[in-house]
Design a protein with these regions (language model features):
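Short, polar/acidic, helix-capping and beta-turn segments at strand->helix junctions
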Residues: 1-183
């Protein structure tokens, strides 16, 4: 119920002077396990599909309980611009939906919620899948990892040691590998 109220506020605010075009929704909430994460994510994705017209905002669900409350929603929007035409297009690779924002000589790619197909895999394999999806988007847009301006990653139990490796180190090794490909 709380998620639906938050989502409705984003839909109501879209297109208004203060809001603009909603391009990304980021939710923070506690998830008991991967099953609950996938259920909540599926609910949110379906809700966005049902209530927004194309181009629909991309969605991220961060399994981290907010300091206050049970659910927090962060809304990213593009303000309406006077005299400058901004185009937001919904794009799809074989596995990921993302947005392409263009204006004059400017182009921005907005993706969200990239996650591994199997959340039970070790961090190294999940990281390879996620960065592979990011690479797929970048190649479709004729870009490279060197073109990324802002990237935010959430790793569950980042300091855990699994199979003798720290989760963060495994993630960082894969990230470095993909970023090195654009040097």
């Amino acid at each position: 119920r709380m998620a639906e109220e938050l989502l409705l506020s984003a839909v109501r605010g879209e297109g208004k002077e203060h809001g603009g075009k909603v391009v990304r929704l980021v939710f923070f909430t506690f998830c008991e396990d991967n099953r609950e994460y996938q259920l909540q994510r599926s609910f949110l994705e379906q809700w966005v599909d049902d209530h927004f017209v194309s181009p629909r905002p991309v969605l991220s669900l961060v399994a981290q309980k907010p300091l206050v409350g049970e659910l927090v929603m962060e809304v990213h929007s593009l303000p309406a611009t006077a005299g400058e035409e901004v185009t937001v297009e919904e794009q799809m690779t074989s596995s990921v939906r993302y947005l392409r924002v263009t204006s004059g000589h400017y182009r921005e790619i907005i993706a969200g919620g990239l996650y591994a197909d199997d959340l039970t895999l070790p961090v190294r394999e999940q990281s390879e899948q996620v960065f592979g999806k990011a690479e797929e988007i970048l190649k479709a847009e004729q870009m490279s990892f060197g073109d990324i301006v802002r990237q935010w990653n959430y790793l569950e139990r980042i300091t855990d040691i699994v199979y003798g490796n720290q989760c963060y180190q495994d993630f960082n090794d894969i990230r470095s590998q993909f970023y090195a490909s654009s040097e």
